[in-house]
Amino acid sequence: MSYPQFGYPYSSAPQFLMATNSLSTCCESGGRTLADSGPAASAQAPVYCPVYESRLLATARHELNSAAALGVYGGPYGGSQGYGNYVTYGSEASAFYSLNSFDSKDGSGSAHGGLAPAAAAYYPYEPALGQYPYDRYGTMDSGTRRKNATRETTSTLKAWLQEHRKNPYPTKGEKIMLAIITKMTLTQVSTWFANARRRLKKENKMTWPPRNKCADEKRPYAEGEEEEGGEEEAREEPLKSSKNAEPVGKEEKELELSDLDDFDPLEAEPPACELKPPFHSLDGGLERVPAAPDGPVKEASGALRMSLAAGGGAALDEDLERARSCLRSAAAGPEPLPGAEGGPQVCEAKLGFVPAGASAGLEAKPRIWSLAHTATAAAAAATSLSQTEFPSCMLKRQGPAAPAAVSSAPATSPSVALPHSGALDRHQDSPVTSLRNWVDGVFHDPILRHSTLNQAWATAKGALLDPGPLGRSLGAGANVLTAPLARAFPPAVPQDAPAAGAARELLALPKAGGKPFCA
């Protein structure tokens, strides 16, 4: 008895039964039912049971007695109707899960129309990925996958780079355009341009100003610009090179301005340490000095020039003025008399100290001289060194002979008052005025004060002009004064020239101070 009003040719009794039974009994009963259909169906029975619904498999259970289970219908209903179609369908449906592909083609034709979509779940890959016909990776379409940069794609990028050598930084829109043309991603395009700029920079072919103004990028840019300038002139037309002249000039101006930013103080010399401006002013100053027609004065000025240039600095300007005044007084003061040939030799002896001692003294002393340090150093040097290295007037105590000789000079000379005013004028230009404390520290004797030195200078000048009774009165004292200098300066003056020796003694340069000493 069937129920055609439901649209199904089987009864509803097994449906209620299968709703109460478990899935394991369905699989076992299905396996026994399909055992006579072939050896292949028994192995596939546990596989297709979870796929189909349990109410469809319940009609294949012929050994179940529906009347005994429900007590409503008689026994003939469960066994009289064979339902052979469903039994044969169960054996044919197992072909969907067999390993043989030919069986699946044969069995698919006899399948039920309502069960055909279920077979799509057992393709070799998932049905959700079946819409991608190119590959079976599951998460990425081949159209969106990255593509390796080939020669055709990089040729487009190289052409763009060649056109924009002055500014090889593509904008966002240009990157998108190039990515569409070359079928690359934006990241690949940006990476390619970054690598191309780095490669050109390593090869010193940069023709663009760097965006970050670093010191290490300026030098390759400058060198590469010169190299590229030579290549472009040989490569391009004159018209194109004339058009490119203006941006290159602007870049050079920017480069000069940017070079001022990283001014290295270690490489550049400070202006205070430069020796050239004092050296040139010294040359110009000494050439204007009216010198004697003899040659030793010019040689002495050259020696002074060399010594001051070797040890000097900006602090020597005042000393140069004083040296010029000394040279003027020495050159213009004593006239070249036939009996007194000590004029040029006096200057030569006075300046002979400069190359030997003044350069060492100037190098040893600091730029701004400390009066206390200079006084103590001069006092220590005067006591430690021998008397042959210093003039006798520079020592602390010479004994009674030298002061007596110097003090007797104003009393015995009636012509002292005439040149004394000129000596006072020259005294204002002497370095003794600037080093008053230093001289006071060295000369402890009250006789050797500045007034006495001025009188001694005037006396010596008078002795040069008139070698008569004054020279004879100064004979013993002059011999005492010139005795140490005879050993210090062997070729300067013979021993029998007391007046010239006294003048040279007073004009001698002290070695410890390193300054031109002119009283």
Curated annotation (Swiss-Prot):
<protein>
    <recommendedName>
        <fullName>Iroquois-class homeodomain protein IRX-4</fullName>
    </recommendedName>
</protein>
<dbReference type="GO" id="GO:0007507">
    <property type="term" value="P:heart development"/>
</dbReference>
<dbReference type="GO" id="GO:0000122">
    <property type="term" value="P:negative regulation of transcription by RNA polymerase II"/>
</dbReference>
<dbReference type="GO" id="GO:0001228">
    <property type="term" value="F:DNA-binding transcription activator activity, RNA polymerase II-specific"/>
</dbReference>
<feature type="compositionally biased region" description="Acidic residues">
    <location>
        <begin position="257"/>
        <end position="267"/>
    </location>
</feature>
<dbReference type="GO" id="GO:0030182">
    <property type="term" value="P:neuron differentiation"/>
</dbReference>
<keyword id="KW-0539">Nucleus</keyword>
<comment type="function">
    <text>Likely to be an important mediator of ventricular differentiation during cardiac development.</text>
</comment>
<feature type="compositionally biased region" description="Acidic residues">
    <location>
        <begin position="223"/>
        <end position="235"/>
    </location>
</feature>
<keyword id="KW-0238">DNA-binding</keyword>
<dbReference type="InterPro" id="IPR003893">
    <property type="entry name" value="Iroquois_homeo"/>
</dbReference>
<dbReference type="GO" id="GO:0048468">
    <property type="term" value="P:cell development"/>
</dbReference>
<feature type="DNA-binding region" description="Homeobox; TALE-type">
    <location>
        <begin position="143"/>
        <end position="204"/>
    </location>
</feature>
<feature type="region of interest" description="Disordered">
    <location>
        <begin position="204"/>
        <end position="298"/>
    </location>
</feature>
<dbReference type="GO" id="GO:0048561">
    <property type="term" value="P:establishment of animal organ orientation"/>
</dbReference>
<dbReference type="InterPro" id="IPR009057">
    <property type="entry name" value="Homeodomain-like_sf"/>
</dbReference>
<dbReference type="InterPro" id="IPR008422">
    <property type="entry name" value="KN_HD"/>
</dbReference>
<dbReference type="GO" id="GO:0006357">
    <property type="term" value="P:regulation of transcription by RNA polymerase II"/>
</dbReference>
<dbReference type="GO" id="GO:0045893">
    <property type="term" value="P:positive regulation of DNA-templated transcription"/>
</dbReference>
<dbReference type="GO" id="GO:0000978">
    <property type="term" value="F:RNA polymerase II cis-regulatory region sequence-specific DNA binding"/>
</dbReference>
<comment type="similarity">
    <text>Belongs to the TALE/IRO homeobox family.</text>
</comment>
<dbReference type="GO" id="GO:0000981">
    <property type="term" value="F:DNA-binding transcription factor activity, RNA polymerase II-specific"/>
</dbReference>
<dbReference type="Pfam" id="PF05920">
    <property type="entry name" value="Homeobox_KN"/>
</dbReference>
<comment type="subunit">
    <text>Interacts with the vitamin D receptor VDR but doesn't affect its transactivation activity.</text>
</comment>
<feature type="compositionally biased region" description="Basic and acidic residues">
    <location>
        <begin position="213"/>
        <end position="222"/>
    </location>
</feature>
<dbReference type="GO" id="GO:0005634">
    <property type="term" value="C:nucleus"/>
</dbReference>
<keyword id="KW-0371">Homeobox</keyword>
<dbReference type="InterPro" id="IPR001356">
    <property type="entry name" value="HD"/>
</dbReference>
<dbReference type="InterPro" id="IPR017970">
    <property type="entry name" value="Homeobox_CS"/>
</dbReference>
<dbReference type="GO" id="GO:0000785">
    <property type="term" value="C:chromatin"/>
</dbReference>
